[in-house]
Amino acid sequence: GQREDGIQAYDAGAVEAALAQVKSTSGGDSLELALYTNVSVGSGKQANNPWLQELPDPVTKVCWDNYAAVSPKLAEELELEDEQLIKINDFGPIPVLVQPGQEYKTISVALGYGRLNMGIPDGTVGQTAFPLIQSTSGTKPNHLPQVTTEKVDVAYQLARTQSHHSMEGRNLGRETTLEQYLADPA
């Protein structure tokens, strides 16, 4: 609220209550789903523009499709491989993309794909993730705690403009001391 002198005031108790609510819905060890807007097709209004479909994601280099991005650690734990299909809750199937740097217990899926009647010859491109957004307290968050996954034993090839030179089996970050480097430069 606002004080009489015009200065904005915040209730610290309300902030603590909000943080406690977020922690209570996170589910601890459960998987979380993060839905995001794709850089090229946005919400999907322009999904029928092939120029936008051809524009690869700046991080994954995937174009013409969306996918479920998972961390290498989660992929290993769930025995998932690149381009294997999975279902998230009852959504999908959607191909997996193992993404270094992805948060461990988080799956990310881009919105804006799977739109019907957009002038695309075969009908759709990708999967529409909009049905996954659940209304809570009148809002529609793009974060869903406590999701489940189910493997579909089928592979699906993603269109990528580059699939080499990403990590080449190395750790995400490498650090050393001068002494270690001089002893073993590899």
Task: Locate the predicted segments by residue.
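A cross-kingdom feature strongest in bacterial/archaeal respiratory oxidoreductases
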Residues: 1-186
